């Protein structure tokens, strides 16, 4: 725990920085800027973003666990994690059974319902959803994210290894957006 104790002030400052910069309105839904590998083509413009909120949910949940182990106050991190999860369920979870990509900050505050793959796997990986939500979100991938067939010539060796025929392999697109870049 000596390393955790040494690094704890860094964790505290970083989470305060995240909150100050990416949740300035205090709604517990975080904007995303340079947050994932696809960031250079995304323009959330201060909106409430699913994957960024999920990352901050996980960060606060883990910070609370570390604080408890160190014997330092952890309530603020427990509360923020719980508030993020509630806000995600209220503001970003859709009746269709998946998380939205994001909600606009300005104007009509539209909810962008066509989530990309990272807005499915990130909240699942971060533990931000119930088992039912996680299952429903993966069904969204099955029914809404393009599955692009991989064409290959059947080979008995590969057929035994993969237990499939030439028409059953797919790669999954990251989204169903066209054009890819939007704002």
What are these regions (language model features)?
Residues 3, 28-32:
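Acidic, glycine-anchored loop motifs typical of Ca2+
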Residues 5-16, 43, 47-75, 79-82, ...:
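Active-site core of glycosidic bond-cleaving carbohydrate-active enzymes
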Residues 19-23, 29:
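Glycine-rich, aromatic-flanked loop segments that form ligand/cofactor-binding clefts
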Residues 24-25, 56:
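Nuclear receptor C-terminal ligand-binding domain
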Residues 31-47:
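Aromatic- and acidic-residue-enriched carbohydrate-binding clefts of CAZyme catalytic domains
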